[in-house]
A protein has these predicted regions:
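Solvent-exposed loop/turn segments at secondary-structure junctions
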Residues: 1-3, 57-61, 82-83, 124
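Active-site lining segments that contact anionic ligands and/or coordinate catalytic metals
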Residues: 48-49, 71-74, 124
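Structural recognition of the beta-strand scaffold that forms the well-ordered cores
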Residues: 52-53, 77-78, 126-127
Length: 164
């Protein structure tokens, strides 16, 4: 991915080119996030800002150092929120919005999304776009998570939010 700048990582010939490129992208991303946080601090915004980082897929190195694409695992990081919590179970992207509302104490919103806040509900499963349930397939939320994909698809494709 561009526009990262080559660093000494690019010349580390003990690693395959694909691994070096991956490390360059990670380095570039880390620098950009650092610059963003520095900008928040220098403009006096940091103390009143919740930083949320989410991905739509995962591009991790396997234990053998081989890059691989994974669309069932993704990062979700919330920083500077005043809440310390580590979620080690499965959750879906659909749970991000309600979780962020919870983190920011915006619980008076009329619409809380289609998922669940991981701070309030023990989410142990997530549904994929194709109806596959990840995590605990017997989770009581699983059928609703599958239904939420259908609702989400209809909202997006049927112009639910379009202006008339």
């Amino acid at each position: 991915n561009e526009p990262y700048r080559k660093t000494k990582l690019s010349g580390a010939t003990e690693f395959p080119e694909e691994v070096r490129n991956y490390m360059e992208v990670i380095h570039y991303t880390d620098r950009c996030i650092g610059a963003f946080v520095d900008s928040l601090r220098s403009n006096g915004l940091y103390d009143n800002t919740v930083i949320a980082i989410a991905s739509d897929h995962n591009q991790l190195l396997s234990p053998c150092g081989v890059p691989g694409y994974n669309d069932t695992e993704a990062a979700f990081i919330v920083a500077n929120a005043g809440v310390k919590y580590t979620h080690t179970s499965v959750m879906g992207q659909i749970d991000i919005y309600p979780t962020l509302l919870d983190v920011m104490n915006c619980n008076d919103y009329a619409w809380k999304g289609l998922g669940y806040s991981i701070l309030r509900t023990p989410v142990g499963s997530a549904a994929g776009w194709n109806g596959t349930v990840y995590g605990n397939e017997g989770d009581s939320l699983a059928s609703r998570q599958i239904e939420a994909w259908d609702i989400s698809e209809k909202i997006i494709t049927k112009g639910y939010f379009s202006l008339k």
